[in-house]
Amino acid sequence: FPLTHINLISVLPVSQEERYKQKVYVRTNEKIQALNQAYQELAQAYHQVSYVDVYSSLLDEVGQLAEAYTTDGLHLSVAGYRILAQALQETL
């Protein structure tokens, strides 16, 4: 068993608004939530692995990637990266 602790970071949400459809393509928050659930279960199965939920911190009131945190519905803006960095600082 390795002695290194592993932090498994959630997959980030997307904005599924019509204007972002081409950029987001086949990604949906429903699929991302299922993947994040699997990541949580994986982390729970191993002593040296923690799950870091950044997904929830980036959502708006309707469950999409908040407009303030994205440049194109998929990639984070500077404000989005601040949220990510804060979550990582709290974990590390």
What are these regions (language model features)?
Residues 18-22, 64-69:
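Short acidic, glycine/proline-rich loop/turn micro-motifs
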Residues 41, 50, 61, 66-68:
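Short, functionally important structural connectors and interaction interfaces within domains
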Residues 1-5:
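A short helix->loop->beta-strand "cap" motif at the edges of active sites that frequently abuts
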Residues 12-16, 56-60:
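Solvent-exposed loop/turn segments at secondary-structure junctions
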Residues 38-45, 57, 61, 87-91:
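Structured segments of extracytoplasmic/periplasmic soluble domains
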Residues 16-53:
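Substrate-gating cap/lid alpha-helix
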Residues 7-10:
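Alpha/beta-hydrolase-fold catalytic nucleophile elbow
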Residues 69-92:
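Histidine-centered active-site loop/cap adjacent to the catalytic His
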